[in-house]
Curated annotation (Swiss-Prot):
EC number(s) given by UniProt: 1.14.13.-, 1.3.1.-
Reaction(s) catalysed by this chain's protein: 3-phenylpropanoate + NAD(+) = (E)-cinnamate + NADH + H(+); N-methyl-L-proline + NAD(+) + H2O = L-proline + formaldehyde + NADH + H(+)
Protein name: Multifunctional alkene reductase/demethylase OYE
Natural source organism: Caballeronia cordobensis (Burkholderia cordobensis)
Role description: A member of the 2-enoate reductase subfamily of old yellow enzymes (OYE) able to reduce alpha/beta alkenes near electron-withdrawing groups as well as perform oxidative demethylation chemistry. Prefers NADH over NADPH as cosubstrate. May play a role in osmotic stress response in situ.
């Protein structure tokens, strides 16, 4: 049995003069929370929550800019101006109050920048080699610009020191320093190109200037991507050269290229379709070959893997960045012997979408108006929740934690709702953790959950509730489609046994996952599948987190026909027993007709609102939710309830068809204020 005193994760680590209180860290990432290019209140509160939660080191400022021609492509921090220093001082004081250390990543994007972002300058690189992902055609960096950028790195590091930070790291992987190291990008024939020693010269000169500006008693690390254009062996050779300079205090090792969407989703930020801790063996091999401390983060989402990495000496500090986006109080729970209560990172990569927000922790990055510590309610209420999908489960969890008397009515034999279908995909099974964690929480809280109970209006009226929350979800939106009786919905396709043979047209009218989960099921069953899309590319809504790349890869492997930009307008039965799907082409306005044995249709969900509408006339608020209060997690305006009345709300897909995060967010912000 692991105790707090013997847990490898809770042992301190000395980095130069800095004593880190445990082995858990959050690595630098672009959270998209800056305001006016600086880490202000929202940004700082996001990181402070992790410090309050017990981790030893939070690194921030992913891709922070040191120069004018490294633009604000990802809403990064601008370290090229002295105006950043007061923000860093407040930030440092805030984090240090909780006993955690604070470091910033500093970099120049090089060719990875966006030439069409202010100030609209040419991008630079060792050689004019275009990056596929960010699409800039860079100019070869001039000797004078090399000197300028080196100076900018030094000044940015000094600003970090002046701001009270404990250290910095520079970023090589895919960025300007790494571009000099990469022989496929660095085609120079001068002293900065050619041999391994020449290609690390720029990195050394940058860090010589940094040391000149910050001195020897400031922690300086190097985020180093293995096999980023170089072989693993040459990467080790480079690391030994860098280590031999005495300029560095640690290596933060990552793996692989990041110059395409797929490479980013596999290497740098491994998604749900990638195994747990995919590059830990590579990082361990790197550590065996160097003398400096080694940090590493890449889908180390669970404590068992993190503990193993430290116990076996594979790493010195373990990065659990996305795990902390899901559960910022992770270390505190470990210390208290309650790690089984930690909200799991399910690997959905939702945090890559627009901001550092978890698919099932809506408080993350919203700390200025949502708390992670759920307070007790001033007055206990009797709450009835109809539906045990993600929204209903979260509503029950929040209400019960606040001390309310909660009952949940669920029509099915198990909890989960539509999420059970979402988790049927071969690489999306971990989504079920969202359900399992909440079911376990409700068991701990002794919530009365009644399965196989289809709620009627009489159930609502007889319960005597003060608050009724409708979380009945949605059903496939086929009603307005002529010939819907000739189609299968995605619910049908994902729950029924696939036909033994025949042809199937799968129609994607939303750009979400569902159509492709169905297509995958039919391909695996050996059917002749074709895809029809309303959008110009598959799974268009999932692109922010890289899932579209997985589906496009799978489609290429399936070798199935794909027709884009066509909208399904009708399905009819043909005389030969097949189904005829009629489409309108959005670009040509032409009518397109396709035949198959089966047609599967994804057009989103329509709210199941019968019970809500029936209950409205008995409610004190007519089922109305004040949006201004709801949007900011404030209490709903008071509506005096008469005898037998209740306050009625609806959340999740029972309100409108959206996603898992929004369903849980609805529940969180409503119930936190009940």
């Amino acid at each position: 049995m692991t105790t707090a005193s013997s847990d490898p994760l809770l042992q301190p680590f000395t980095l130069k003069h800095l004593v880190l209180k445990n082995r858990v860290m959050s690595t630098s990432h672009a959270s998209r929370l800056t305001r006016d290019e600086f880490p202000q209140e929202v940004y700082q509160r996001y990181h402070e929550e992790k410090a309050k939660g017990g981790l030893a080191l939070t690194m921030f400022g992913g891709s922070s800019n040191v120069s004018l021609d490294s633009p604000n492509t990802f809403q990064q921090i601008n370290l090229s101006a002295d105006a950043v220093v007061p923000h860093l001082r407040r930030f440092s004081d805030r984090i240090h109050t909780h006993g955690a250390a604070l470091m910033c990543q500093i970099t120049h994007l090089g060719r990875r920048g966006d030439a069409y972002t202010e100030p609209w300058l040419p991008m630079i690189a060792p050689s004019p080699v275009r990056e596929t992902l960010h699409r800039a055609m860079p100019q070869a960096i001039h000797d004078a610009d090399i000197k300028r950028v080196i100076r900018d790195f030094g000044l940015a590091a000094k600003r970090c020191r002046d701001g009270g930070l404990d250290g910095i790291e520079t970023h090589a992987g895919g960025h300007l320093i790494g571009q000099f190291m990469d022989p496929t990008v660095n085609l120079r024939t001068d002293k900065y190109g050619g041999s391994t020693a020449n290609r690390v010269r720029f990195a050394i000169e940058v860090h010589e200037e940094i040391r000149k500006q910050v001195g020897d008693d400031f922690v300086v690390g190097f985020r180093f991507a293995l096999e980023d254009g170089c072989s693993f062996e040459e990467g080790l050779e480079m690391s030994r050269i860098l280590q031999g300079t005495g300029l560095f205090d640690f290596f933060n090792v990552t793996f692989g290229r990041m110059d395409t969407k797929m490479a980013l989703a596999v290497n740098s930020m491994p998604g749900m379709f990638v195994p747990s801790a995919p590059w830990l063996p590579k990082a361990a091999a790197f550590k065996r070959a160097v003398d400096l401390p080694v940090f590493h983060a890449a889908k180390i989402a669970d404590l068992a893997t993190a503990r193993y990495a430290i116990r076996e000496g594979l790493l010195d500090m373990v990065g659990m960045t996305r795990a902390h986006i899901a559960e910022p109080h992770l270390v505190k729970l470990v210390e208290a012997g309650k790690e089984d209560e930690a909200r799991p990172c399910v690997g959905a990569s939702f945090c890559r979408n627009f901001r550092a927000t978890c698919i099932h922790n809506p408080a993350t990055s919203r700390e200025t108006y949502l708390t992670h510590d759920i307070p007790k309610a001033a007055q206990t209420k009797r709450v009835l929740i109809v539906g045990a999908g993600p929204a209903g489960l979260e509503a029950a969890r929040i209400c019960a934690t606040r001390g309310h008397d909660v009952t949940v009515l669920e029509a099915n034999s198990t909890a989960g709702g539509q999420l059970l279908l979402a988790a049927t995909g071969s690489w999306r099974r971990d989504l079920i953790g969202i359900v399992d964690w909440r079911v376990s929480a409700l068991e701990r809280l002794s919530v009365d959950v009644r399965y196989n109970h289809y709620a009627e209006l009489s159930d609502v009226l007889d319960h005597g509730a003060d608050v009724v929350i409708i979380a009945t979800g949605g059903l496939p939106n086929l009603d307005a489609l002529p010939g819907a009786e000739h189609c299968k919905s995605v619910f049908d396709a994902l729950t029924e046994t696939p036909p033994r043979e025949g042809s199937v047209i799968v129609y994607d009218g939303t750009g979400r996952h569902n159509a492709y989960l169905c297509a995958e099921r039919y391909v695996d069953a050996g059917l002749d599948v074709s895809l029809a899309l309303i959008d110009s590319m598959p799974a268009q809504e999932t692109g922010g987190r890289g899932d579209d790349q997985v589906w496009m890869r799978n489609i290429a492997r399936w070798d199935v026909p794909v027709r884009t930009n066509i909208e399904l307008i009708e399905v009819t039965a043909s005389s030969n027993g097949k189904r005829r799907a009629v489409f309108q082409h959005h670009l040509t306005n032409e009518r397109v007709e396709l035949e198959a044995d089966h047609v599967v249709v994804e057009r989103g969900m329509l709210a199941v609102e019968d019970l809500f509408e029936a209950a409205r006339m008995y409610s004190a608020n007519d089922g109305y939710t004040d949006l201004e209060a709801f949007a900011t997690g404030k209490p709903q305006p008071g509506h005096e309830a008469e005898e037998g009345q209740f306050h009625l709300y609806r959340i999740g897909d029972a309100s409108a068809s959206r996603d898992i995060h929004t369903a849980i967010y609805d529940a969180y912000r409503l119930c936190l204020a009940l």
